[in-house]
Swiss-Prot record:
Reactions accelerated catalytically: [protein]-L-isoaspartate + S-adenosyl-L-methionine = [protein]-L-isoaspartate alpha-methyl ester + S-adenosyl-L-homocysteine
Gene Ontology molecular function terms on file: protein-L-isoaspartate (D-aspartate) O-methyltransferase activity
Keyword Methyltransferase tagged: yes
UniProt protein name: Protein-L-isoaspartate O-methyltransferase
HAMAP family, sorted: PIMT (MF_00090)
Pfam family name, one: PCMT
Example of a GO biological process term: protein modification process
Keyword Chloroplast: no
Active site: S76
Length: 228
């Protein structure tokens, strides 16, 4: 596999009992479902996913299931994280906007695969926990904001990649405008319970190409240009 730096200044906490075996099973399951980007597999195999959930759930961290993280939010199943990360087609020099920090796990995956992550979380308590968690791990190439993610990053700037980790009724216009020409966005669109995972590529100043990747299920994207 390709060597990937996780940009950690401190070693990760040791995995729980059976953790290494569970990680191996997780990676094999991801590969069997079409995850082939060696960088994504390397990063997800190295990250201590159990550190992103309550201790009581640590034994379930590497199973292919969503897990609660509080405030009615969830940590996406490993396949979903891997699928979205792979679909972004990340480069190490890229700046990535993430809407929905959540536990910080997806943020950590992105941080290992690009130059800098700009992440927005609307729930202050989750944003604080995620920031503390990532800083403890020594991940330093992330900028954090608390606010309405449907409005994008507060300072106007283009991003090569945008990832949205909650289901939107439609793609927020502000996010479309913050995607640079030639850039790519991965976003779940649809109803509150079921969505389609969409890849949006900006092809010109006023043109975007949309492709449906697969069915998915996310918590609702709440905000001015999302759900109430």
């Amino acid at each position: 596999m390709v060597a990937v730096s996780l940009k950690m200044s401190q070693p990760a906490a040791p995995p729980p009992p059976m953790g290494e075996r569970a990680r191996t099973r997780m990676l094999l399951a991801l590969q069997s479902r079409g995850i082939h980007d060696p960088r994504v597999l390397e990063v997800m195999g190295a990250l201590p996913r159990h550190d992103f959930v309550d201790e009581a759930l640590a034994g379930h961290a590497y199973g292919d299931a969503t897990l609660p993280i509080g405030e009615g939010q969830t940590l996406s199943q490993p396949y979903t994280v891997a699928r979205m990360s792979q679909a972004l087609e990340l480069g190490y020099g890229m700046h990535v906007l993430e809407i929905g920090t959540g536990s910080g796990y997806q943020t950590a995956v992105l941080a290992a695969l690009c130059r800098r992550v700009y992440t927005v979380e609307r729930i202050p308590s989750l944003a604080l926990l995620a920031r503390e968690r990532l800083e403890r791990m020594g991940i330093t190439n992330v900028r954090y904001r608390v606010g309405d993610g449907t409005l994008g990053w507060p300072e106007p700037r283009p991003f090569e990649r945008i990832i949205v980790t909650a289901g939107a009724p439609a793609t927020p216009e502000r996010l479309k405008r913050q995607l640079e020409i030639g850039g790519r966005m991965i976003i779940p669109e649809g109803g509150k319970l079921n969505q389609q995972l969409i890849c949006i590529q900006r092809t010109g100043p006023e043109s975007w190409q949309r492709d449906v990747l697969e069915a998915c299920r996310f918590v609702p994207l709440v905000g001015q240009q999302g759900w109430e």
